[in-house]
Amino acid sequence: MDLPEPLHDFLLVFLGSGLILGSLGVVLFTNPIFSAFSLGLVLVCISLFYILSNSHFVAASQLLIYVGAINVLIIFAVMFMNGSEYYQDFRLWTVGDGITLMVCTSIFVSLITTILDTSWHGIIWTTRPNQIIEQDLISTSQQIGIHLSTDFFLPFELISIILLVALIGAIVVARQ
């Protein structure tokens, strides 16, 4: 979007805080329905980030697929489950939680240091998207593919990692 810089910065901070609060709600709420609604807030904030970065197609896909389908499916699955059996053995803190916290914190710190130490300006893409998109012979689906592999490479990879984690989580839940 072509917004004035102070408004753009305000929206970035607002969406970032909504994203952080929603993700904390997903993890910290003991009621699974509240966690699912917090996940919906996180996914909506991510799609609004895509709108701010002028990738409206990815934002619409995010809203339709994740918020409209996946999150609603999660809410229905949680509503059909018997929740009383999960709260009988509830403990506030275990040794496994501490180990998980240490591992996740170390991964988070290593990712932050890697992101801050990387010179992102030195990355050279093999194709320049402006040169390719100016050609009239390329169809719309090819333009989307070029954008996904050049301009939106990092968000596309992050979405694939989120899908992988969701698949692994679904397998773990299905085995129990």
UniProtKB/Swiss-Prot annotation:
Q: Look up the domain of life of the source.
A: Eukaryota
Keywords of the record, alphabetical order, are: Chloroplast, Membrane, NAD, NADP, Plastid, Plastoquinone, Quinone, Thylakoid, Translocase, Transmembrane, Transmembrane helix, Transport
* UniProt membrane topology term: Multi-pass membrane protein
- What EC number(s) are associated with this protein in UniProt? 7.1.1.-
Q: Which GO terms describe its molecular function?
A: NADH dehydrogenase (ubiquinone) activity; quinone binding
Report any Pfam family annotated for this entry.
Oxidored_q3
Residues making up the signal peptide according to the UniProt record: none
- Tell me where in or outside the cell this protein is found: Plastid, Chloroplast thylakoid membrane
Per its record, the protein catalyses: a plastoquinone + NADH + (n+1) H(+)(in) = a plastoquinol + NAD(+) + n H(+)(out); a plastoquinone + NADPH + (n+1) H(+)(in) = a plastoquinol + NADP(+) + n H(+)(out)
- Look up the record and report any one GO term of the cellular component aspect: chloroplast thylakoid membrane
Residues that span the membrane, as ranges? 10-30, 32-52, 63-83, 92-112, 152-172
Give the principal location in a single coarse category: plastid
Has UniProt tagged this entry with the keyword Thylakoid?
yes
Query: Which top EC class applies here?
Result: translocase
The family database entries (PANTHER family) matched by this protein are listed as: NAD(P)H-QUINONE OXIDOREDUCTASE SUBUNIT 6, CHLOROPLASTIC
Family label: Belongs to the complex I subunit 6 family.
| Known role | NDH shuttles electrons from NAD(P)H:plastoquinone, via FMN and iron-sulfur (Fe-S) centers, to quinones in the photosynthetic chain and possibly in a chloroplast respiratory chain. The immediate electron acceptor for the enzyme in this species is believed to be plastoquinone. Couples the redox reaction to proton translocation, and thus conserves the redox energy in a proton gradient.
What quaternary arrangement does the UniProt entry report? NDH is composed of at least 16 different subunits, 5 of which are encoded in the nucleus.
Q: What's this protein's name? A: NAD(P)H-quinone oxidoreductase subunit 6, chloroplastic
What lineage does UniProt assign to this protein's organism?
Eukaryota, Viridiplantae, Streptophyta, Embryophyta, Tracheophyta
